[in-house]
Amino acid sequence: LFLKLMDEASEIQAHAGGTIMLPEHLLWKHFQGMGGQAILAYLKDVVWPEMGKKYGDIFGKEFLIESPEILADIVGQLSALNLTSADTDIKGDAFEYFLKNAYQGVSIKDLGEYFTPRNVVRTMVSMVDPKFGEKIYDPFCGTGGFLIESFRYLKLRTKTTDDTDRILRKETIYGSEITSNARIAKMNMILFGDGHANLYRHDSFAHPQTGKFDIIITNPPYSQKTRYGNLYPVPSTSGDAVAMIHCFDALNEGGRACILMKEDFLTEGGDVGAVREYMFKNAKNFSVVSLPRKMFEPYTPTKTSILYFEKKGGRNS
């Protein structure tokens, strides 16, 4: 899917007189007419290693498809399609289908963080209303849904020049993900126009980002534990508490956040309550949008809300 979309994007750029995204010998049309065994050998021995050099860890070290017949069938069916003209949701559906099948050994509850409903994603992006030149950060980016939508939101509202294109691609989108889905997030960003340069695979809790971003938009994991809470203004071992303080701390003064949270955050005591009190002292313009309980089923029955706020200048302990 990635190679087919890259090929279509390169063809569009070539017709527009631009530079194609891939060398000629890596384009889809170069191998689509080969037999199954020849396609398998070419992708494994030529395309995969070169794409690995170009895009780093987006491509795994091993080419995992072993059946020439299955590969030839995939190539044949994709060759008949024009994916670029399809609604972007169709591309997202394809990646979600892949993830759900690739993670058959993982409980459906554990997959919930990756499949935030798109209407929720779009609502949250419109709430923060990104502006050109702002830095947008998702510290728990999963497969990149919030970052993709933010990137698309800006692209539609920004006049394209070499400078604006460079800033959007390299100085706007930031994210991290602890699982191997960081690779999928990077791939997703490239397919939707780039912005993958500042996506990292690491534990966000271990990497505070104090005052660096204009916008935080995220769906953090729920009910986790962390040993990195002592790195933050309100120390805790509760992942729920540290996720919120990580997001708050990463905002610059005047920055705004939109976070999909467990509704319990509004009433819990203990460490979560301490973080909530700290945020109420140091932020303003709070808004809460309560979501239906079944919004995330079948992944999780957890009742959730969208929390919006803006960070004040200075800090009150």
Over which residues does each language-model region extend?
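Non-catalytic, mostly N-terminal accessory regions of nucleic-acid modification and defense proteins
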Residues: 1-128, 132, 198-204, 290-294, ...
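Conserved short secondary-structure elements within globular domains
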Residues: 280-293
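Conserved S-adenosyl-L-methionine
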Residues: 110-218, 223-230, 237, 241-242, ...
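Flexible, glycine-/basic-rich loop-and-beta segments that form/coincide
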Residues: 297-317
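Short strand-turn motif at the edge of the Rossmann-like AdoMet-binding core
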Residues: 261-264, 293
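Structured alpha-helical segments in the cores of large, soluble enzyme domains
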Residues: 243-251
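Acceptor-substrate binding/catalytic loop of class I
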Residues: 264-269, 297-298
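Short glycine-dipeptide loop
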Residues: 251-257
